[in-house]
């Protein structure tokens, strides 16, 4: 790893911050809307979140993102890896996918229900249930390598339990807290995909 920083670490002269800034500028030039870029928990680990899109466009953005990161890292004399668990004994890298359901005719969210558990609608809860029921089969697609399973171990904020929760990062599906007035942002986070997966599947 190129640094020993921690979560949201930032210090003057931070080479990693310069690289993240270059990556962010390049992604914006490629019309990928970056929402956040910061150091993650593990040494040499970084997170760059980009804005939601329709599924196919999001998959395109994911592939473009990887090529961009690798190219800019190389220009800085670094090697970027998207391995789920490149270093034993520290947190691995996931590719958490935030998902929402929209009405195809109106574009309105189908996720929100003020009377539902965690403010989730019945279709949203059924959507989550389907992913939990089929989690083992989905793992072949979203965690497709031997290294994927080195990440999915207890103690490293990895999703190791087939369940859903609001605050427990060990859950396969997390439900971000509801923000009043932002009902259209209601979503669920599928936490067990990792960067080695094919985003088109």
Task: Place the predicted regions along the sequence by residue.
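Glycine-rich, acidic/polar active-site loops that bind/position phosphate-bearing ligands
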Residues: 1-201
